[in-house]
Amino acid sequence: MDPFHACSILKQLKTMYDEGQLTDIVVEVDHGKTFSCHRNVLAAISPYFRSMFTSGLTESTQKEVRIIGVEAESMGLVLNYAYTSRVILTEANVQALFTTASIFQIPSIQDQCAKYMISHLDPQNSIGVFIFADHYGHQELGDRSKEYIRKKFLCVTKEQEFLQLTKDQLISILDSDDLNVDREEHVYESIIRWFEHEQNEREVHLPEIFAKCIRFPLMEDAFIEKIPPRFAQAIVKSCGEKGPSNTNGCTQRLGMTASEMIICFDAAHKHSGKKQTVPCLDIVTGRVFKLCKPPNDLREVGILVSPDNDIYIAGGYRPSSSEVSIDHKAENDFWMYDHSTNRWLSKPSLLRARIGCKLVYCCGKMYAIGGRVYEGDGRNSLKSVECYDSRENCWMTVCAMPVAMEFHNAVEHKEKIYVLQGEFFLFYEPQKDYWGFLTPMTVPRIQGLAAVYKDSIYYIAGTCGNHQRVFTVEAYDIELNKWTRKKDFPCDQSINPYLKLVLFQNKLHLFVRATQVTVEEHIFRTSRKNSLYQYDDIADQWMKVYETPDRLWDLGRHFECAVAKLYPQCLQKVL
């Protein structure tokens, strides 16, 4: 059987369609636009047309048929799909094409449109997509858009489209354990906002909505006492509808269980050789969890936790089977972590493969900055910078840095990006796509650590030009364009420390991996301790506030730390 036979026939049919050869039906759509095509092709792809041409009705013998409610662009896309199996989707055409595919009963096009809309969900369009999916009864599109709304609930409720939900649609969103709210009061406030949009029509629904959606035991008594009498009466009715169980214990919403944790990437489990693991430390409770490791065992990835608490990784390399290989092949992978399922979701690849790039969120977009590759004559640092627009779901090249950088740091403050490495200190303005130079740090060094804290950029530790490791601390006042030396981090070089800087619970912290060598009965023994130090900016000193449990994992020299709010019930508990 020739596998290319069907493709060849389809190609020839497309040629005849383009040239108007042997066409036997003219389809007229809105605004009088006509398309000459082949009945057999239309009937083969669409039960709607098959029924039209074989039913014996008037249309089956006509040489021209008129279809009302179909746009010309959508009809053209359907025909292109019929003759090529390909369809080009955009935000402007996807819903109209879905509607046309629904009329013509072509589920394969509907599914492609649904997949496109799912991949382009954002706080601005998610409600509209959910309403659209509910209207057409598309299960997957409805479920996925509803999941997104629950995940981004606080952002979504600010949108005007939230007010267009029907009563049943609103209940289907709010009556869920997976709602990402840290306080039940947010749910109540969203209902009141929805109600106030059309008070006369919606007041009758309040008791039912309160009964099904509000978990009053999770609300503060002081808040309940301040509820206006008008709504209090509806609450009393709701309690009557739901019965005594309404005042008993309630399951917490997903967002209420979130705990800020320190995530360690590029760690190896103690009992699995060099197999990577991603431990998550809940400092407050002392619990340790494990995050799903990056796909393909990626190492030295760029890491970012967005303001919306989304975790992204980009670039990196896959470990070589050879123990001696150091020229790793750079990857262009881009992944987003799904909190509820504890897995990584594939996103559009970087335009440029890169190891050790820095990811920064600025002005609503994500930037991948610098890094290194092993190409041509060996190891090369990168100047290139690219930007990810979640609305367009794609990366685009922006102005490159004036100097190539690896082992650098990048932070954001007030819609500007700051990049530091050695004697170079750069700033980038996304609105102008412009890079400029700033006053370099007083002790130039690479492989240091940077974070923004109280309108200053703190730069800590690093390696000087003579390859000497230092634990210098400097703070750059962004408004004054001035560096200030702080007290060095007190650290004993003999313990071979490796440091990572994080902003945890709104304070600067250093996560320190220390190696201790002891001699017992003429046998050298190596042990490692991982500790957390908190910075007191008033006293200008560091205090140990936590020590991790021993022997859970091994942090190598290239480990990285990030801070995010995680959901314990979605993670694997280690300790």
Swiss-Prot record:
Gene3D superfamilies: 1.25.40.420, Kelch-type beta propeller, Potassium Channel Kv1.1, Chain A
Main location: cytoplasm
UniProt GO MF annotations: ubiquitin-like ligase-substrate adaptor activity
Any one Gene Ontology BP term: neural crest formation
Pfam families assigned: BACK, BTB, Kelch_1
Domain BACK: 126-228
Keyword annotations: Cytoplasm, Cytoskeleton, Golgi apparatus, Kelch repeat, Repeat, Translation regulation, Ubl conjugation pathway
CC terms in the record's Gene Ontology section: Cul3-RING ubiquitin ligase complex; cytoplasm; Golgi apparatus; spindle
Places the protein is found: Cytoplasm, Cytoskeleton, Spindle; Golgi apparatus
UniProt KW Membrane keyword: no
InterPro entries: BACK (IPR011705), BTB/POZ_dom (IPR000210), BTB/POZ_KBTBD8 (IPR028764), Kelch-typ_b-propeller (IPR015915), Kelch_1 (IPR006652), SKP1/BTB/POZ_sf (IPR011333)
PROSITE patterns: BTB
Renumbered ranges of Kelch repeats: 310-364, 365-415, 417-455, 457-506, 516-562
BTB domain mapped to chain residues: 23-91
Function: Substrate-specific adapter of a BCR (BTB-CUL3-RBX1) E3 ubiquitin ligase complex that acts as a regulator of neural crest specification. The BCR(KBTBD8) complex acts by mediating monoubiquitination of NOLC1 and TCOF1: monoubiquitination promotes the formation of a NOLC1-TCOF1 complex that acts as a platform to connect RNA polymerase I with enzymes responsible for ribosomal processing and modification, leading to remodel the translational program of differentiating cells in favor of neural crest specification.
Protein family per UniProt: Belongs to the KBTBD8 family.
Quaternary assembly: Component of the BCR(KBTBD8) E3 ubiquitin ligase complex, at least composed of CUL3, KBTBD8 and RBX1.
Protein name, entry field: Kelch repeat and BTB domain-containing protein 8
Lineage, broadest ranks: Eukaryota, Metazoa, Chordata, Craniata, Vertebrata
Gene: Kbtbd8
